[in-house]
Amino acid sequence: IALQHVPEEGDLLGVLWLIDKYIVHSNEDDLMEVITNNNDWRSLVENEISQEQRPFSLIEQPKNDYLEIPSHTDKEHIEILERIKQSIADGQVYQVNFGRFWTSKLIESPKVIFYRLLKSNPAPFSTYISAEDLGFAIVSSSPESLLKCQNGFVHTSPIKGTCERGNSIADEKELREIMIEDVKERSEHRMLVDLMRNDLSAVCEVGSVNIERFDVETYSNVQHLVSHIKGKLLPEENGLTAFNSIFPGGSITGCPRTMVCAVIDEIEMQPRSFWTGSAGWIDVHSGDCSWNILIRTLQAT
């Protein structure tokens, strides 16, 4: 597709780091494992870990008086939504995920913001990346897994459908039932699941792509409709080719994907950069990998 609003020359489109040493921290048992072939680095890190660490403490969150500038005004946002609904009614598209951006000056470091999010809105695929040499940092509180590949099997867990938690267990249950029965929420979710199943089918054995589970998952502040889809990779495919088939995620684009990517480019009028991309890792030897979708994301430059 031909894009009207392309990244400027010099803009980062993605970053890949080849990692030969790293630290794995298990949240379940609070243990750390140092993985490297460099014994000097291992000794240095293990010695640092063994030292008594001062707990990281957060001060009261300061007030940000800087103006937040939206990419679209509320009026423009409503007008664009009406255009999208008309395009759906005309049969041009089935689903479009239109986003807005807010720009402002930070009064705290991205690292501190990430710690605040871990406390206020913990999410299973949260991400913090700091690359001072490249001039950017990413903070994401993402609940969504785009792709996991392990031992020849691939998994994706698309999210579409959201409601509040409510103020009580009874409220939460009622809101959940309303969301489950909502025709719009279920229709959007079905379309998304069909899209992701089709993407996986391109790299998986015939008949192996199935929905393992469809459920409501509860997070700190919201409830989501989530499907878990699994497939068995063809012998000639791997995690990288699966990623190429499934990226960008359907939940942040829409369907049909090629058409809606052109529509999104037209209505958002700027590149999305890292937001709605993915952060993750891939084993270059086995092809095993895990990638999230960078939603609920802050990009600092």
PLM region spans:
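Extended alpha-helical targeting/anchoring segments
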Residues: I1-T301
